[in-house]
Design a protein with these regions (language model features):
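Nucleic acid-binding interface residues in structured DNA/RNA-binding domains
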Residues: 1-100
Length: 100
């Protein structure tokens, strides 16, 4: 399994209505220093219907300005459709964090 496949497998583990950070996904995929690689892998996500990359946020709970599948507003809409509250472009990780 290559690095991107490892990342995609971890993203698939984020439950409905929850989020994870790039760093958490990196650590779960095998290397906590892969945060930027996680971001790149999600940007080229080959299967966004099954690999829910919109559930990944930064360490502060902030949405991505460069969300590859419609921008920040699309990411916000997708998260809100799962019942996740987004305020000022941020998600409360204490409430919605999957792996805290």
């Amino acid at each position: 399994m290559n690095t991107f496949e490892k990342i995609y497998e971890q993203v698939k583990k984020i439950p409905y209505g929850k989020v994870a950070t790039y760093g958490q996904i990196a650590a779960m995929a095998g290397n906590p220093r892969w945060s930027q690689i996680v971001g790149y892998a999600l940007h080229v996500n080959p299967d966004p219907k099954n690999i829910k990359c919109y559930r990944v946020v930064n360490r502060f709970g902030e949405l991505s300005d460069n969300f590859a599948f419609g921008g920040k507003s699309a990411q916000e809409q997708l998260l809100e459709s799962e019942g996740i509250t987004v305020e000022d472009g941020k998600v409360d990780l204490k409430i919605y964090g999957a792996f805290l």
